[in-house]
Amino acid sequence: MIQKLKAKGFTYNATLDMLEGEFNGQPVRVTVVTDNNKVYRICLIDENNCSESQIKIRFNTLCRQFENNKKYLPMKDNQEISESEDISYEMLVHKKEYQAGFYQIGPEGTTSFLDKSLEELEQISKKVVWFTIGDHYGQYYIIMYYDNYNNQANGEDL
């Protein structure tokens, strides 16, 4: 997976022990998490922080991009943040977390999704992408995860 990311232009930063590059038009840092040489998580972290109003726009734009992509199915309806939401207050005072999640249903999209068996639907639920807002001293950034629970440790080494 790391070689595939390098082929897409990502470069290794030895100081951070992460890959760096551009994803969806934004500079990001990437970590790849494996278990028994199988990738079960790819984590992308925005390299640049932004203001509260900018992060709302970025978060909502990502929600719309995933909702409009036939390869993904939203985990719940309307995951966008309202314009009136005071993110800084909610995160600081109420420890609120802003997250959006989508199932990866494959290149065939939702049309054949309805024809899937229960077993196939269970497999779809094990491949998700989700993102959240991180905070660093009043500046915000997106952390995005691509998870494949099929490759995650489930206690088999215990």
What annotation goes with each model-predicted range?
Residues 2-12, 48-158:
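Non-cytosolic coordination micro-motifs
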Residues 23-65:
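Mid-chain, structured segments of secreted extracytoplasmic proteins
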Residues 1-27:
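Start-of-domain marker
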Residues 16-18, 37-39, 137-141:
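A generic structural signal for beta-strand entry/edge sites
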